[in-house]
Regions:
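Short beta-edge/loop segments at beta->alpha junctions of small alpha/beta modules
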Residues: 1-72, 108
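Structural motif detector for alpha-helix initiation sites
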Residues: 3, 18, 77, 141-142
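A residue-level signal for beta-strand positions that form part of recognition/binding surfaces
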Residues: 15, 111, 163
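Hydrophobic/aromatic-lined pockets within catalytic cores
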Residues: 26, 85, 150-154
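Short coil/loop linkers at secondary-structure junctions
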Residues: 28-29, 87, 190
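Short gly/ser-rich loop at a beta-strand->alpha-helix junction or flexible surface loop bordering the NTP-binding
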Residues: 37, 43-52, 62-123
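Hydrophobic alpha-helical interaction segments
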Residues: 125-205
């Protein structure tokens, strides 16, 4: 297949799956992927998923790929907590929550991890846009914190919560108007209620 024709069809999406390609071009030869990978036109994201090489410098492109190559999912936990200033460490791994099974991928755009939750816990996120309007699902800081504590059972003592070094000012901000309590209630988890109670005790919010 002519690469220029292929690029014109898919480049606006920055990445694509083999399923999408076959739907658009039923007689597509998968051998083209090897050729285009060898020429540096595209990069492999994961099995049957590829991205165009020239989008690498697009701000936020990793955020976008995180949601595209494993869906449904949304960015959450440490990645969003760091971005919101809730934890002091910078986080280079794209951490997401999904209703699919737990998974992880590594490619030229970064490391991507996905933690599995029940479908009914897939809430508390909104859509942001990067590049030329590419959509990204991102948890609110309150939901990111709750996802993190729900999925990491070791944070169950005052000492462990204190070791997170959460920013008290950011915590206070996300606790306003009962936003944090509302998220906690939707989980229906006694363990999460207990951990958030410890957070409030340690950071006096």
């Amino acid at each position: 297949m002519n690469y220029i024709t292929f690029r014109e069809r898919f480049h606006d999406f920055a990445c694509f799956s083999n399923e999408q390609v076959v739907a658009a071009f039923p007689r597509f030869d998968r051998g083209n992927y090897s050729t285009w990978l060898g020429k540096g036109y595209i990069k492999r994201l994961r099995r049957s998923w590829y991205a165009f090489d020239d989008v690498a410098g697009t701000p936020g492109i990793g955020d976008y790929f995180a949601g595209r190559m494993y869906s449904p999912s949304y960015l959450s936990c440490e990645y969003v907590m760091a971005r919101a200033g809730l934890i002091p460490e910078s986080v280079v791994q794209f951490t997401s929550v999904t209703s699919l099974k737990t998974a992880s991928f590594k490619n030229d755009f970064g490391e991507f991890s996905y933690r599995s939750v029940k479908p009914e816990l897939m809430f508390g996120y909104g859509v942001e846009h990067v590049g030329d309007g590419l959509p990204v699902n991102v948890a609110t800081p309150a939901k990111a914190l709750c996802d993190f504590l729900y999925l990491n059972s070791q944070y169950d003592t005052l000492e462990e919560i204190e070791a997170l070094r959460l920013d008290a000012d950011v915590l206070e901000e996300i606790s306003r108007d009962s936003a944090l309590d509302g998220v906690v209630a939707r989980f229906g988890s006694r363990a999460l209620v207990r951990r958030i109670k410890l957070v409030k005790e340690v950071y006096a919010i």
